[in-house]
Swiss-Prot record:
SUPFAM superfamilies: DNA-binding domain. GO terms for biological process: cell division; ethylene-activated signaling pathway; induced systemic resistance, jasmonic acid mediated signaling pathway; phloem or xylem histogenesis; positive regulation of DNA-templated transcription. GO terms for molecular function: DNA-binding transcription factor activity; transcription cis-regulatory region binding. Residues 181-219 are annotated as: Disordered. Belongs to the AP2/ERF transcription factor family. ERF subfamily. It is found in: Nucleus. GO terms for cellular component: nucleus. Acts as a transcriptional activator. Binds to the GCC-box pathogenesis-related promoter element. Involved in the regulation of gene expression by stress factors and by components of stress signal transduction pathways. Involved in disease resistance pathways. This is Ethylene-responsive transcription factor 2. Induction: Induced by jasmonate (JA) and Alternaria brassicicola (locally and systemically). Ethylene induction is completely dependent on a functional ETHYLENE-INSENSITIVE2 (EIN2) while wounding induction does not require EIN2. Transcripts accumulate strongly in cycloheximide-treated plants, a protein synthesis inhibitor. Seems to not be influenced by exogenous abscisic acid (ABA), cold, heat, NaCl or drought stress. SMART domains: AP2 (SM00380). Pfam families: AP2. Residues 192-206 have a biased composition (Low complexity).
Length: 243
C-alpha cells in the first residue's frame, strides 16, 4: 500500500505548510481517524493537529480532504498528481474543394445531307431539275425537266444517259432502267407558271382598257350630239324672233 502511494515529498510539503499555519497543538484538536476513505491519507495525515474552532485549520482540512477523496475501488494514487501526457494531434484542415462547373457539351447536330444524284440539282423553290450533257452537241447541256423528287429527276437522267451512251453510261439506278417502269412525270416550272399568269393578267388588263376607252368614246359622241341639238334649237328660236 505504501509503495503504491509514492508521494511522500508532496505530503511533507503539505505537512510543513499545515504546521506553519497551525503553530502547534491546542485543546480542541481534530485528528483524522480511520473513517478517511484513503488509507494513504490516514497514514500520512492522521497525526496532524487541527483545531475545530479555527477557520484556517478547517480550510486546510477541507482542502486536504477534497484532495485525497477519490474512489475507494482505485488502488493507484498516482492519478491525483501524475496525469498522463495528452498527445495533441494536429487537426487536419479540410479545405473544401470547389466544384468546377461542368462544361456544357455542345450538342452537335449532324446535318443530314441529301443524297446527291448524278445530273440532278435542286431548284430554289425546292423542286429538282434534271439535265445531261450531250456529247453529240460538244457537251452542251440538255434540259430534261423539273420533278417533284430527286429520285424522279435521277431516273430521268438515267433514261437519257442510257439512250445516249448505252451500257457505258454511269447511272444512278442501273436496275430501274429498261425495267418497264413508267417514266417520271415532269412538273411545270415556276417561271412558266408565273409567265402564264402574267400574260393572262396582261391580256385581261388590256381588255379592260379597251372597254374603258370605248365607253369614253361613246360618252363623248353622245355629248357632242346633245350639244349640236341644243345649238340647232337656239338658232331656230333666233330666226323666229327676227322674223
Amino acid at each position: 500500500m505504501y509503495g503504491q502511494c509514492n508521494i511522500e515529498s508532496d505530503y511533507a510539503l503539505l505537512e510543513s505548510i499545515t504546521r506553519h499555519l497551525l503553530g502547534g497543538g491546542g485543546e480542541n484538536e481534530l485528528r483524522l481517524n480511520e473513517s478517511t476513505p484513503s488509507s494513504c491519507f490516514t497514514e500520512s495525515w492522521g497525526g496532524l493537529p487541527l483545531k475545530e474552532n479555527d477557520s484556517e485549520d478547517m480550510l486546510v482540512y477541507g482542502l486536504l480532504k477534497d484532495a485525497f477523496h477519490f474512489d475507494t475501488s482505485s488502488s493507484d494514487l498516482s492519478c491525483l498528481f501524475d496525469f498522463p501526457a495528452v498527445k495533441v494531434e494536429p487537426t487536419e484542415n479540410f479545405t473544401a474543394m470547389e466544384e468546377k462547373p461542368k462544361k456544357a457539351i455542345p450538342v452537335t447536330e449532324t446535318a443530314v445531307k441529301a443524297k446527291h444524284y448524278r445530273g440532278v440539282r435542286q431548284r430554289p423553290w425546292g423542286k429538282f431539275a434534271a439535265e445531261i450533257r450531250d456529247p453529240a452537241k460538244n457537251g452542251a447541256r440538255v434540259w430534261l425537266g423539273t420533278f417533284e423528287t430527286a429520285e424522279d429527276a435521277a431516273l430521268a437522267y438515267d433514261i437519257a444517259a442510257f439512250r445516249m451512251r448505252g451500257s457505258r453510261a454511269l447511272l444512278n439506278f442501273p436496275l430501274r432502267v429498261n425495267s418497264g417502269e413508267p417514266d417520271p412525270v415532269r412538273i411545270t416550272s415556276k417561271r412558266s407558271s408565273s409567265s402564264s399568269s402574267s400574260s393572262s393578267s396582261s391580256t385581261s388588263s388590256s381588255e379592260n382598257g379597251k372597254l374603258k376607252r370605248r365607253r369614253k368614246a361613246e360618252n363623248l359622241t353622245s355629248e357632242v350630239v346633245q350639244v349640236k341639238c341644243e345649238v340647232g334649237d337656239e338658232t331656230r328660236v333666233d330666226e323666229l324672233l327676227v322674223s
